From Swiss-Prot:
PANTHER family: GLYCEROL-3-PHOSPHATE DEHYDROGENASE, GLYCEROL-3-PHOSPHATE DEHYDROGENASE [NAD(+)] 2, CHLOROPLASTIC. Pathway: Membrane lipid metabolism; glycerophospholipid metabolism. Its EC number is 1.1.1.94. Keywords: Cytoplasm, Lipid biosynthesis, Lipid metabolism, NAD, NADP, Nucleotide-binding, Oxidoreductase, Phospholipid biosynthesis, Phospholipid metabolism. GO terms for cellular component: cytosol. The keyword Acetylation does not apply. Belongs to the NAD-dependent glycerol-3-phosphate dehydrogenase family. Catalyzes the reduction of the glycolytic intermediate dihydroxyacetone phosphate (DHAP) to sn-glycerol 3-phosphate (G3P), the key precursor for phospholipid synthesis. This is Glycerol-3-phosphate dehydrogenase [NAD(P)+]. NADPH binds at residues 10-11, 31, 104, 135, 250, 274, 276. Signal peptide: none annotated. One of its GO terms (biological process) is glycerophospholipid metabolic process. It is an enzyme of class 1 (oxidoreductase). It comes from Caldanaerobacter subterraneus subsp. tengcongensis (strain DSM 15242 / JCM 11007 / NBRC 100824 / MB4).
Length: 330
């Protein structure tokens, strides 16, 4: 099967190598000419994952050639680039091609989910792939389970068949809203978990952040039309656990630096790669106001990273809020 993977960052590189092992004809496209020339010369991705690319993976800097005759097009660029790439794909891919989106985020300007942005330009079936899936582990064939979501069940099942093997298991879900929100919003809570670690707090604090974070993710999700049970699955609890606890998590690592006193700008510079939770915090904060949903953790993280609020003060505010029933608003 001809599969185009758009984006040669960590996720794009990992999924390209995975699909190549399944004997698909993989075309890996990257926007950066510098990165393209380096990979052509060395077949080694030094910036992302530090891995070698098999010679059977075809490399492209020309988007039109990369997607030509592709049966599946995988969008593996950061969320802020999804609109640009989707617009460039318009009229360039087969009407029968299935688009698989890996980006986890909410567009800051429009507050749209990634599949909504893609559908502005493409009439193709769009399948969302989400769940606890650090690229560093996927590329090493460490057992991983994720979820596929689409309104088109047949498209989901087609991708399930094409992408799945003994180390990469995929489930099908029709709740696109819930799967996308779970994948995006957990990055905010991971920032908070990192801030907690940076402040020197313990496991109790992180467990509370994760659990109450899941509660506010669920509240917003339900208000936006998703099934609350989705957040108990791989795109919800699963992704939340791995992103809040792993050293691979850029969001957690950025949070740790902020908790230790660095500014957002300093933290992002030190990470050196996209930290999706930063823009998602802006989007979620606005969505909570639009939908009238209580998201106290998101609100405090917003105040810390965008308004320079003292993290200790933010924790105090969370701990001294009005008394609540645990399932309030769910």
């Amino acid at each position: 099967m001809k599969i185009a993977v758009l984006g040669a960052g960590s996720w794009g590189t990992a999924i390209a190598i995975h699909l190549n092992k399944l004997n698909h004809q993989v075309r890996l496209w990257m926007r950066s000419k510098e990165q393209f020339e380096e990979l052509i010369a060395t077949r080694h991705n030094s910036r992302y994952l530090d891995v070698d690319l098999p010679s059977s993976i075809l490399l492209y800097n020309d988007l039109d050639k990369a997607v030509e005759d592709s049966e599946v097009v995988v969008i593996a660029v950061p969320s802020h680039a999804v609109r640009e790439v989707s617009e460039k794909l318009k009229g360039k891919i087969s009407k029968n091609a299935i688009v698989v989106n890996l980006a986890k985020g909410i567009e800051t300007s429009s507050l749209k989910r990634m599949s909504e942005v893609i559908k502005e330009y493409l009439l193709n079936p769009v399948v969302v792939l989400s769940g606890p899936s650090h690229a560093e582990e996927v590329v090493r064939q460490i057992p991983t389970a994720c979820v596929l979501a689409s309104e088109d069940v047949k498209a989901c099942e087609f991708i399930q068949e094409a992408f799945m093997n003994e180390t990469f298991r995929l489930y099908v879900n029709t709740d696109v809203i819930g799967v996308e929100l779970g994948g995006a919003l957990k990055n905010i809570i991971a920032l908070g978990a990192g801030i907690s670690d940076g402040l020197g707090f313990g496991d109790n604090t992180k467990a509370a952040l994760m659990t109450r974070g899941l509660a506010e993710i669920t509240r917003l999700g339900v208000a936006m039309g998703s099934d609350p049970l989705t957040f108990l699955g791989l795109a919800g609890v699963g992704d939340l656990i791995v992103t809040c606890t792993s050293n691979y998590s850029r969001n957690r690592r950025a949070g740790i630096l902020i908790g230790k006193g660095k500014s957002l700008k300093e933290a992002l510079k030190e990470i050196g790669m996209v930290v999706e939770g930063v823009n998602t915090t802006k989007s979620a904060y606005r969505l909570s106001q639009i939908y009238g949903v209580e998201m106290p953790i998101t609100k405090e993280i917003y105040s810390i990273i965008f308004e320079n609020k003292n993290p200790f003060e933010a924790v105090y505010n969370l701990m001294t809020r009005d008394k609540k029933h645990e399932l309030h608003g769910i």
